[in-house]
């Protein structure tokens, strides 16, 4: 029977641990800003009526300086909520106008994309919005002058929902 020397046993243990760490890492898919297998939760207590108004983009994901922050105007009409936006999403400017079709608590289908409100502060001054596929995420604020504590809270919520904060950009 063969006996392992302490050095060989240590070497094998290090290799096993390295393999476990490598398997536990979740690389983000190309162009996505969150791990696809991470949990994501929308705000179950969101009051959609309180979303109406003008919002300024104060943060998002993508390369710094790739585009300028934008905003969203949400209106209420006979058909429900409607969004008109110009946003920096993933480092590219996106513009559009579409109904915000309810798709569950805190969840909307906007122009064929899932916009999930992950968090709104208690006074509806700040929103963290994400999408299950991780293609974008952004933070909106009514004033544009977001406080440090609300920005920190939005970052924490995005991280908790699997977003890669190394790619987070504050404007």
Predicted features along the sequence, with ranges:
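Flanking scaffold residues of small Cys/His-coordinated metal-binding clusters
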Residues: 12
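A beta-rich soluble binding module of mature secreted/lumenal proteins
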Residues: 2-4, 15, 20-171
